[in-house]
Amino acid sequence: MKKNKYEIDMCNGTIMDKLISFSLPLMVSGILQLMFNAVDIIVVGRFSGSQALAAVGSTTALINVFINLFMGISLGANVLAARYYAAGRDREMSETVHTSIMLALISGVVMAFVGVFFAKGALELMDTPADVIDQSALYMRIYFMGMPFFMLYNYGAAILRAVGDTKRPLYFLIVSGVINAGLNMFLVIVFSLDVAGVAIATVVSQAISCVLVLRCLYKSEGSYQLRFSKLCLKKDYIIPIFQVGIPAGIQSTVINFSNVLLQSSVNSFGSIAMAGYTAANNVLGFLYTSVNSVTQACMSFTSQNYGVGKYKRMDKVLIDCLILSSGMALVMGGGAYLFGTEILQIYTGDPEVIRCGMEILSITTVPYFLCGIMDLFPGALRGMGCSAVPMILSVIGTVGTRIVWIFGIFPQHRSLYVLFISYPGSWIITIIMQVICYLIMRKKVYSRAAAVIKKRKKTKKPRKTAE
C-alpha cells in the first residue's frame, strides 16, 4: 500500500517512535483546541471580570455533556476506517468516509438546535447563579451555532488519524487558533462584546478549521478521498460505527454528567470558587489532552494491526502506550503542581480565585497519570471493536464513585480539596476493573484468532506428489 508523506505505517517496524510521531501532533492539536477555550477564559477574565469568567467556565461541563455522545461516534468512524485502510479494502474505506461525514453533518445540525433552544433551561437545572446565568446562556447559544463546523472538523480529523495522518489537522488548527486569538482580543477589547465576543471568535475559528479539513479530504488521492456527491448513510457502515462509537459516546456523556454534578457542588461555594474551578479545570484539560493523544494512538494502532491480524503486535502497542502516557502525565502533572500559582495567574489576578484553583490542582495534578492508564485499556479494546463492556465499567467506576462521594462524603466535609479527592479515587477503582476486563476480552480475541488460523490450515489442499 503506497503511503504519502503524512501517513504512518502502524503495522511494521518499531512502535515507540511511531507512537510519538502520531501522538505529538495530536497532542498539540488537542492543546490548540483547548486554547480556543483558554483564550476565551483569559481574555474574559482579564478584560471583563470574574463574573464573566464564571459565566464562560460554568458552561464547559454542560457543553461536553451535549456533544460527547456525537463525538464518541467519531471514534467508531476512526476504528472502522483504520481497519479497512490497513487491510487495503478501498471500497469499504471510501463508503466509511462518506457515511462518517454525513453523520457529522446531521449531528452538528441536531446539536445546534438543542444548544440554542435549551441552553438556559439546562443551566437552571445546574443551579447556575442568577448573576451569571444570562451571560452563560448567551455564550452557549452562540457556541452551539458552530456545532456543524465543530463536528465536521472532528469527524474529518478522525478519518485522517485512521491513516496515520495527525500533522495536517495540526496545521489547520494552528491557522484557526491564531485567528481565534486575534478575534478574541478584537471583539472583547475593541468592541466590548464580552462573552458574546469570545463565543463568536470560537465559532469563526471552528468554521475555518472545518473548511480546511474537508478541503484536505477532497484533494486526497485514494480510498479516503471525499466527494460530496457520494455522501450517504449506509447501514452496513453505520452499524459497526455505532457499535464502537455509541458506547464510547455514552461513556463520555455520563462521565461529563458526573462533572456537571461536580460543577453544581462547586457552584454552591459561589462565583469566586466557580472562577477558580474554571481556571484549574482548564489546566487539567491540558493534562488530559496529553494522555488522550496516546489513547487515540493506541486505538488507531490497535485497530490497524487487528485489521491485518497482527495480534502479538497489539500487546506491544499497549505496553509502549502505557510507558509513554504515564511518563508524559508525571512530567506535566508535576510541573502543573509546582508552578500552579504562576499558571493560574495567567487566567486571573484575583488572589481568592487563585487560592481556590490551587486547592483543586493540589489533589488532581500529580496523580493524573492514573487517568491515562484508566483510558488506555478501554482504548485498546475499542481498537479491537469491543466497546460496550469497557463503557459499562467506566461508568460504574468513574461515575458511581463520584456520585457516592458527592452525595455521601462531601456534605460531611465541605471543601474543594475534599470534593476533588473523588478524581484520583475514581481513577484507581476504574483501573482495577478495566485491567481485569482487558485480560478476559484479550484472551477471547486471541482464541478467536487462533481458531481462524487453525481452520485455514485445515482447509489448505495438500500438495500432489509425483507418482
Each PLM stretch: what is its role?
Residues 12, 16-35, 39, 62-69, ...:
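Residue-level signal for short hydrophobic patches within transmembrane helices
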Residues 53-113, 150-169, 276-334, 338-340, ...:
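Small-residue-rich hydrophobic transmembrane alpha-helices
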Residues 65-68, 180-185, 210-214, 286-289, ...:
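Hydrophobic transmembrane alpha-helices of multi-pass small-molecule transporters
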Residues 22, 26-34, 71, 103-112, ...:
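Hydrophobic alpha-helical transmembrane segments in multi-pass membrane proteins
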Residues 35-54, 123-130, 186-195, 253-286, ...:
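Helix-terminus/linker motif at the lipid-water interface of multi-pass membrane proteins
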Residues 74, 143-161, 169-177, 198-213, ...:
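Short runs within selected transmembrane alpha-helices of multi-pass transporters and secretion channels
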Residues 1-23, 81-146, 188-246, 302-367, ...:
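Short alpha-helical transmembrane segments in multi-pass integral membrane proteins
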